[in-house]
Each structure stands twice: as structure tokens, then as C-alpha cells.
């Protein structure tokens, strides 16, 4: 209701207002007020009433000769926001309808269903993208007629960038410990076995999931588990705290309770258990020693070798860091331009900053995919757009253009025809062009000229553009260069010099090249020759790595010398046009001769006098942002990397009349550079690079490893399923067509870069440690054995350890028995040798991870399936289908039997019946060592940061006028 009352008040005020300045003031205030309104919070009825009032006010302002373009654009933006909200509501309703419907609709059904709605989301997406990217992609703000293909919308889950830093004491041991009693066998068949002294063992619960996740192969299981473990490992190579307690057996010493040691000490301190006396004797020497001078700590632990290996990996492959002090000094030097930067506090010697982790893998992926490269460049442009200082324009150019017309004495009869000469000159074009020029200094782009190409204003603007823009072939396409030259010739030179208009044809595409020696005015010819030199821009800062950032370029125009070639060329060209028009009774197609000559004199003064502030403004911005070139986001030129990929560059739109608008529109010096904002931006880029590198390299490493283990797996599908996009650029990888992504992951250079990443090395080291843990830990109880021995005749059960009564586990492979591996048998290798051993009734050993079927004592004692398979292993292990194909078709299970129940006496009948032909090969159980392992780690507070600016205090010390680094003022009135 407040909005409606405000608009009613403004409408009444307009009725009483008569002065044009007051109308303009009301218009500007209304634009600001409309910008502060949130259209999504207003009801439909109230919004319709507000629209009516706005339209009435706009009509009144137009009647008062006030240009209302900005107000109408703002109102259109608000309407589009409401349209997008309605579209989202319609799409949600559609999803509910589709969920209720059993049949799945096709894409065409969706399109037809949506098209019947009052608001079509496909067209709405176009409008929304136009709204969001208009300033970034430099879409023509005047013309509504353009097409844009929008694929089917996808929701992208982009998580905020957070960097979690964990120290070593946060590590949770993966291998638990347990206390288990020894079984003492009875020599008397009438007496049951008894329990002996207990022992502390390492458990193997860590491999509980091995049967459910190793169906595709044990190697894939190791890689998947290594990837999960990498996320759980600490990423800082030091301790910041340690859980200590007094040694209960020696009050002068301390014991470490971290890393799961508290559980061990609780077990050992059971004084009723005399079997642990040796452990208690060793425990009294456990101690924690802190060296405050060297900042280290030594302590005792009893951990499984696998846990110790993971600790070493986490310390060796901790996240790379850099010293904070040099970076703070660099920031202080950068901000010395107009600011005084001081450290807030003294920095500790161990104060660290996360290193600049720039992913060469991501850079290579951008080189292989044009859409991904452009997406990343657009994202970088969007990030950098907030850094520019371009608040140098007046609110409107209408008064300026009116003065030019008045000075040219244009009669009111021909005002319509003349108005078209400068009708495209406006502030929107100037801002768009200035943004384009600033971005072209850091990014290499292709130009796309838009707007009218047949007016006097566009021709004057093209004449200036040929002086400012880089016209060399590497930076400007021949087509764009020809269009600019032909426009200047046809609209300015041909009419003024009374020459025929140039028409493009095969072999003659450039008017300047065609007529440079055709006897034109000498001043005009000099300008044409200077343009045909096709001069590039000057390099201002060289990039350290062209695969990451392109060189920073600036226009090749002098900042102080008015006799520079560019200024002289423009001045002489306009003098030549004026001179030629003196002898010509009809020097322009729409403007009378006298008016044209006076108009050209005014334009000469404007172009020559106001070009230098434009060049200084560009240099003022580029000089300062270029100083942090090595901290900026990705801005590489794909043409530098591969000369065949010029078409993959981003194409930016520049209004044809933008350069004249820019020259006429600058009226003041820009705002001062806020170095606090610029250096905070550098911190944000460092965090973004870190998050992108982690996300890309982790998922790519898993994809390569899984493909190495099984060539049938798709690297592309694994990568897409594993990647967690931290930025829209990473999320855009999911939109790359399937075949293109497959081709990218076939690139040998990309794969080699992935293999050389920090993530790949960590995951590979963890997988190797997992393989060693599997080989040396008992895993038969979890359903997987190291191998099996198949006998032709049933044998007595053995006893693999002192913790069981009997079992069919062997800890060593018997000598003198033929061995086969499962992989060979599945490939059909040596299968005939296996059959020969079976026919000869010889025992065989099958090596490799073998799935097990666990049986209990009751099943063995009765004639059950377990009894039969354990006593006829050949028939159970070899299937008739294997004989047809002469290879092992699938992994076959074998029986595992463990009897740990001593609560009954031995029975002769049991001993006769309970025999087996299958023995499982496994590793022995690991006993927790009595004497501890001594660990030594750095020990200090967490002094790692991802932000430098929070350690710096900014104090403004600005000069009265804004200057370039060489002392020149940006703008002089």
C-alpha cells in the first residue's frame, strides 16, 4: 500500500510541475525508488494497480520530452522476475502431475504440456538469461530481436566454498582392538576344552563391507574405499592438541589417550587378569614429551600397521601451504596506491596460508572443450566486473546532442532526418563499450558488432574504434575489420569526397585497401594508411603462465602527448573530411551542406579533446588490476594454446555507436580504487581455485583408477557421479555432451596430468596400504579368503590359532602342490592343467580372493549341503558349464568352518564325520604389541588461514586527484 500511495503522490506532483529539470529529477528519483522495490513480495492485484500508475506516469513524462528508457527497463526487469516466479510454480505443478501419472511422458509431451501454459518456461529462460548476462556478455540493450538456444533446464547443486582444515589428532583409528581368551584343548575325551589367559588382538571389522562392495572386483573395492578414506584423513601435518592423562603405573609419566589408546589402557588395567602382567610392566614406561622450543611432541601408541601407514600418508601428503608473512608483505606493497596498509598483529613463525592450488587438470579440460572454456571465461568476467571503476558518465547525453545540433544550425524542418545521425548515442552504449574494452585487456575475445551500421554517429564511432581497438589479425577478425573500414568509407568519405559507394565483392572486401591510392584528400589517405597498418595493443604486464592467464594489453595510444600518431590521424582525417566537403554541394545523404560542415567541426573538437580521458581511464583500471594478474581467475587465451581453436573464443557484443558515446559521455574522474575490495577478491579467487582443484582432481583420479582396474568401466560416468561442483564452472561439465566428454577423457595428456595430481598420489598410496592390510589381515570371517586348497580325499580339521578349537584355515600354502590363480582361470588360461590335476586326483591350490560360505559346527556334523560340499570340493567348485567354455565363468564360493565353542567334550563320532576336503588360505591374527611405537609430530596451534586481508589494517591516504602511476591525472576538466 505504501508503494501505491507514493505513486499517487508522484502523479499529483507531475500535474503541478512545469519545468523540465523538475520532470527529470522526478524521473531519476522514481528510478531509484523502483530499484528498491521487491516485486516478488507484492500480490497480483496490487501489482496490476502499480503497473497502471507507472504507465500513467511514464506517459506524462514522455509528454514532457523526458527520455524514460531507464525507467521502462527497470519496470520490465521487475515484470520478468515475477514471470520467472510464475514459471517455477508451473514447473513444480507439472512435476507433481508427472509423479502422479504412472506413464512417463516423453520430452515432446513435456514441451506440448508446457506450451499450453500461459507462461512458457522456454521463452522465459531466454528472457532470464538475457537479464542476468546482459552486462557480462554485452548483449545489445537496444535491439530485442535476437535468438538464443536454451537446452532443457537442469538444476545444478553448487555447494558454497568451505575449506575444512583438520589436524592429525582428529584421526580416528580404523582398526579396533578386542580381548579374546586362548582355548586350551583337553587331552581327555570326556572333558571339555577350557579357556586360558586372554590376549589383546587387532580386530578386522574394517573389512566388514568387503563382501557387499567387492562384487565388481577387489581392486575396485580398494580404490572406492581409498577415496572415502582420503576424505576422512587429516590434511594438516601437525597436532594442535593431545588428550593426555597421568600414567596410572608411573605418576611421573603421562600417557596419550588419543588415537584410540584409551581403550587399550582400560583393558590392560584390569588387574584381576594376571595374563596382562607383561603389558602392565611395559606400560609404566609410556610417556608424552613436549618440546616447546622446537614445537614437537613425542608419545607412545600401540596401533595397527595400517593405521600407522595412514598417519604417515596424511603427514606426507598434507595440503600444500605457504608462509603467510611474504604474502602479507606483497599485499601491503600492492595496496600502497592510495592506501596505507599495516599489519594488525605480529605473525608467528608457523603462520601458514593455503597455497595457490591451480588445477592444471581443469585448465587442460578447458582446452579440450570450447563450451567449458567459454563458461569459465564468462565466470571470470562476471567475478571481475565488480572491480572496475567506471562511474564516470553523466545521466544522459540528450543535452549534449541538443547542443551539437544547435551549434550546427540544423533547421527544425530536417530535425527528424538529422536526429537519426546521433540517435544511437547513449550512455548504455558507452558503459557497454567501456566494459568490453576493460575485459579485452585481460581476456582475448572475438568482437561481434551490433546496432545500426548506416548512420553518421555509427560511422564516427567506427572511425574512433579503428584507432582504439587492436586491429591486428590475432585479435580482430578480417570480417570485423572490413565492416568497420567500409562503414567509415561509405558514411563519411564517399559522400564528402563525392565518390561512389563501395560494395563488397569477391577479391575486394575492404574499401580502405581498394581506395587508399585512388587520389583522395591527403589527410584522409594518411588516416587510411595508418588504419591499414593493423596495429596491435601494447603489452602492459606479462603473464607467468599463458595456460592460466593471458598477457595484459592496453591500447597503443599515448597518455600525455597530443601529437601522438592516433590523435594526429583522427584530427587530420576530420580536417580532410571538412576540406573535401567544402567543394561538395551535397556532402551527406541526410544533412545539408552547411550543417554537415559545422557538425563535423564540433565532432572534431569532441573526438580529439576527449579521447585522451578515455585512454587514461582504461589505463587507470588496467594498471591496478594488472598488478594482481597472478592472483586473478582463469583468463587464458585458447588461441595461444592451440592455433586451430580461434572459433572457440568468447564472442562479445559491442555497439557500433559505443565509442562515440564513450568519448562524449565521460564527464568526471572515476572513483578511487578500494584496495580492500581488490585484495579480498584475490583471497576469494584463491579459495575458489582450491575448491575447484579438489573437486575436479578427486573425482578424475577415482575415474582413472577404476578404469585401470577394469577397462569396461566408463571414466566419464564415474567422473560425473563423483564430482561435487563448488562453482558453476565445474557444474557446467555435467552439460558437456556425452561423446565429447568421453573423447576428453581419452586425451593422453589429460590422463598424465591427472596421474600427476596430489589427489591421485594420495588415493593410490591409500589403496596400496589397503592391499597390504588385506594380504596380512585375517579376512575369512568377513567372507573373503586369500585362496583355497582343494584335496581329493577328506582330511582332518586343523587348528590355525590358539583362539579356536578347530577350523579349516591354513596360514601357509602347502609346498609341492600345483597352484592356479582365479584371474587366469576366468580368462581361460591353464584351465586344461586344472582339469588334468583333477583327473589325476591331485590336490590343487586356487590363489586369489575367493568368496566364502561360512558354516557352523551343527551343519558339519549332520549330512547337509555344507557337509557335502566340504567333502566333494571338485564337484562343488567346477560347474559343467565351465567345461563347455573351458574357463571359470564366475567366482565360486567355498566353505569355511570355525569352531570356537569349548563348552562340550570331544566326541569320537564327531571326529569321524567332521572332516573336510577344503582348506582356506588366510593370514594370522595380529596381536597388539606389548612394546609401543614412538611417534614424533610437530605440535602447535592451528595457524593456517585462507584469508590474508584479515591480518591487514587499511587506512585511506588518497591524493586530491586520481592519478596514473606516472603522475598523470585521469580526467582534467
UniProtKB/Swiss-Prot annotation:
Gene Ontology MF annotations: RNA binding
The entry's keywords: Capsid protein, Inner capsid protein, RNA-binding, T=2 icosahedral capsid protein, Virion
Main location class: virion
Superkingdom of source: Viruses
Gene Ontology terms: cellular component: T=2 icosahedral viral capsid; viral inner capsid; viral nucleocapsid
InterPro entries, A to Z: Rotavirus_VP2
Residue ranges of coiled coil: none
Keyword Chaperone attached: no
Localization per record: Virion
Family note: Belongs to the rotavirus VP2 family.
Function: Inner capsid protein that self-assembles to form an icosahedral capsid with a T=2 symmetry, which consists of 120 copies of VP2, with channels at each of its five-fold vertices. This capsid constitutes the innermost concentric layer of the viral mature particle. It encapsidates the polymerase VP1, the capping enzyme VP3 and the genomic dsRNA, thereby defining the core.
Assembly notes: Homodecamer; each decamer is made up of two conformers of VP2, called VP2A and VP2B. Interacts with a VP1-VP3 complex. Interacts with the intermediate capsid protein VP6. Interacts with NSP5. Interacts (via N-terminus) with NSP2.
Protein name in the entry: Inner capsid protein VP2
Organism of this sequence: Rotavirus X (strain RVX/Human/China/NADRV-J19/1997/GXP[X])
Amino acid at each position: 500500500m505504501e508503494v501505491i500511495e507514493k505513486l499517487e503522490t508522484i502523479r499529483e506532483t507531475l500535474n503541478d510541475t512545469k519545468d523540465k529539470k523538475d520532470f527529470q529529477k522526478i524521473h531519476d528519483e522514481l528510478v531509484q525508488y523502483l530499484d528498491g522495490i521487491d516485486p516478488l513480495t507484492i500480490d497480483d492485484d496490487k501489482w496490476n494497480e502499480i503497473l497502471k500508475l507507472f504507465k500513467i506516469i511514464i506517459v506524462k513524462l514522455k509528454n514532457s520530452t523526458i527520455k524514460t528508457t531507464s525507467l521502462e527497463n527497470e519496470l520490465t526487469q521487475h515484470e520478468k522476475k515475477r514471470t520467472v516466479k510464475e514459471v517455477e510454480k508451473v514447473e513444480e505443478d507439472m512435476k507433481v502431475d508427472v509423479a502422479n501419472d504412472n506413464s512417463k511422458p516423453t520430452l515432446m509431451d513435456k514441451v506440448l504440456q508446457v506450451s499450453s501454459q500461459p507462461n512458457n518456461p522456454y521463452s522465459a529462460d531466454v528472457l532470464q538469461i538475457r537479464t542476468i548476462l546482459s552486462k557480462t556478455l554485452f548483449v545489445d540493450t537496444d535491439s530485442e530481436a535476437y535468438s538464443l538456444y536454451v537446452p532443457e533446464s537442469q538444476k545444478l547443486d553448487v555447494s558454497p566454498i568451505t575449506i575444512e582444515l583438520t589436524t592429525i589428532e582428529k584421526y580416528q583409528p580404523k582398526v579396533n582392538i578386542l580381548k579374546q581368551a586362548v582355548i586350551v584343548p583337553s587331552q581327555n575325551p570326556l572333558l571339555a576344552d577350557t579357556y586360558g589367559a586372554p590376549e589383546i588382538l587387532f580386530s578386522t571389522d574394517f573389512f566388514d563391507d568387503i563382501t557387499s562392495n567387492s562384487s565388481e572386483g577387489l581392486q575396485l573395492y580398494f580404490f572406492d574405499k581409498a577415496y572415502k578414506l582420503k576424505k576422512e584423513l587429516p590434511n594438516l601435518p601437525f597436532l594442535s592438541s593431545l588428550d593426555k592423562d597421568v600414567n596410572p603405573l608411573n605418576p611421573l609419566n603421562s600417557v596419550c589417550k588419543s588415537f584410540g589408546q584409551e581403550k587399550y589402557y582400560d583393558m590392560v588395567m584390569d588387574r584381576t587378569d594376571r595374563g596382562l602382567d607383561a603389558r602392565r610392566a611395559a606400560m609404566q614406561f609410556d610417556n608424552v614429551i613436549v618440546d616447546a622450543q622446537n614445537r614437537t611432541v613425542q608419545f607412545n601408541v600401540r596401533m595397527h600397521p595400517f593405521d600407522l601407514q595412514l598417519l604417515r600418508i596424511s603427514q606426507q601428503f598434507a595440503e600444500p601451504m605457504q608462509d603467510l608473512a611474504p604474502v602479507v608483505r606483497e599485499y601491503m606493497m600492492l595496496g600502497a596506491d592510495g592506501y596505507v596498509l599495516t599489519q594488525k598483529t605480529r605473525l608467528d613463525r608457523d603462520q601458514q596460508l593455503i597455497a595457490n592450488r591451480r588445477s592444471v587438470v581443469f585448465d587442460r579440460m578447458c582446452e579440450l572443450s570450447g563450451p567449458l572454456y567459454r563458461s569459465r571465461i564468462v565466470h571470470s568476467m562476471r567475478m571481475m566486473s565488480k572491480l572496475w571503476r567506471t562511474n564516470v558518465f553523466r545521466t544522459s547525453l540528450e543535452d549534449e546532442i541538443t547542443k551539437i545540433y544547435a551549434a550546427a544550425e540544423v533547421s527544425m524542418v530536417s530535425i527528424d532526418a538529422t536526429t537519426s545521425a546521433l540517435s544511437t548515442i547513449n550512455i548504455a552504449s558507452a558503459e557497454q563499450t567501456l566494459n568490453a574494452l576493460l575485459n579485452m585487456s585481460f581476456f582475448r575475445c572475438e568482437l561481434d558488432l551490433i546496432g545500426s551500421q548506416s548512420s553518421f554517429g555509427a560511422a564516427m564511432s567506427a572511425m574512433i574504434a579503428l584507432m582504439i581497438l587492436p586491429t591486428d589479425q590475432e585479435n580482430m577478425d578480417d570480417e570485423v575489420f572490413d565492416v568497420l573500414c567500409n562503414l567509415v568509407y561509405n558514411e563519411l568519405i564517399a559522400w564528402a569526397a563525392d565518390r561512389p559507394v563501395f560494395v563488397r565483392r569477391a577479391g575486394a572486401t575492404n574499401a580502405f585497401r581498394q581506395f587508399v591510392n585512388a587520389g583522395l584528400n591527403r589527410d584522409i589517405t594518411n588516416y587510411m594508411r595508418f588504419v591499414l597498418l593493423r596495429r596491435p595493443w601494447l603489452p602492459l604486464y606479462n603473464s607467468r603462465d599463458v595456460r592460466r592467464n593471458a598477457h595484459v594489453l592496453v591500447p597503443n595510444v599515448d597518455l600525455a602527448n597530443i601529437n601522438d600518431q592516433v590523435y594526429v590521424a583522427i584530427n587530420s582525417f576530420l580536417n580532410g573530411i571538412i576540406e573535401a566537403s567544402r567543394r561538395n554541394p551535397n556532402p551527406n545523404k541526410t544533412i545539408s551542406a552547411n550543417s554537415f560542415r559545422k557538425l563535423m567541426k564540433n565532432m572534431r573538437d569532441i573526438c580529439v579533446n576527449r579521447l585522451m580521458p578515455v585512454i587514461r581511464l582504461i589505463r587507470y583500471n588496467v594498471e591496478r588490476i594488472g598488478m594482481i594478474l597472478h592472483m586473478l581467475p582463469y583468463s587464458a587465451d585458447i588461441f595461444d594454446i592451440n592455433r586451430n581453436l580461434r572459433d572457440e573464443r568468447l564472442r562479445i557484443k559491442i555497439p557500433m555507436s559505443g565509442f562515440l558515446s564513450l568519448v562524449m559521455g565521460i564527464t568526471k574522474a572515476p572513483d578511487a580504487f578500494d584496495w580492500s575490495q581488490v585484495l579480498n577478491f584475490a583471497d576469494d579467487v584463491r579459495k575458489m581455485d582450491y575448491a575447484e582443484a579438489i573437486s575436479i582432481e578427486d573425482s578424475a583420479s577415482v575415474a582413472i583408477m577404476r578404469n585401470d582396474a577394469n577397462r569396461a568401466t566408463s571414466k566419464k560416468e564415474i567422473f560425473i557421479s563423483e564430482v561435487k561442483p563448488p562453482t558453476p564452472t565445474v557444474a557446467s561439465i555435467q552439460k558437456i555432451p556425452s561423446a565429447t566428454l568421453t573423447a576428453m577423457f581419452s586425451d593422453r595428456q589429460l590422463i598424465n596430468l591427472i596421474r600427476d595430481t596430489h589427489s591421485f598420489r594420495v588415493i593410490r598410496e591409500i589403496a596400496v596400504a589397503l592391499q597390504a592390510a588385506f594380504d596380512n589381515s585375517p579376512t575369512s570371517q568377513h567372507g573373503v579368503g586369500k585362496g583355497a586348497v582343494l584335496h581329493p580325499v577328506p582330511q582332518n580339521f586343523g587348528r590355525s590359532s590358539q583362539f579356536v578349537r578347530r577350523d579349516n584355515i591354513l596360514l601357509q600354502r602347502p609346498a609341492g602342490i600345483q597352484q592356479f590363480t582365479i584371474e587366469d582361470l576366468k580368462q581361460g588360461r591353464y584351465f586344461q592343467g586344472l582339469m588334468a590335476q583333477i583327473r589325476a586326483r591331485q590336490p590343487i591350490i586356487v590363489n586369489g580372493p575367493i568368496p566364502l560360505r561360512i558354516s557352523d559346527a551343527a551343519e558339519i556334523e549332520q549330512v547337509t549341503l555344507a557337509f557335502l560340499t566340504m567333502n566333494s570340493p571338485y564337484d562343488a567348485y567346477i560347474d559343467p558349464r565351465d567345461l563347455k567354455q573351458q574357463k571359470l565363468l564366475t567366482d565360486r564360493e567355498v566353505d569355511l568352518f570355525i569352531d570356537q565353542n569349548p563348552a562340550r567334550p570331544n566326541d569320537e563320532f564327531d571326529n569321524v564325520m567332521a572332516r573336510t576336503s577344503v582348506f582356506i588360505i588366510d593370514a594370522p591374527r595380529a596381536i597388539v604389541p606389548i612394546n609401543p611405537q614412538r611417534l614424533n609430530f610437530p605440535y602447535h596451534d592451528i595457524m593456517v588461514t585462507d584469508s590474508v586481508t584479515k591480518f591487514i589494517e587499511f587506512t585511506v591516504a588518497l591524493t586530491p586527484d586520481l592519478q596514473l602511476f606516472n603522475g598523470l591525472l585521469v580526467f582534467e576538466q
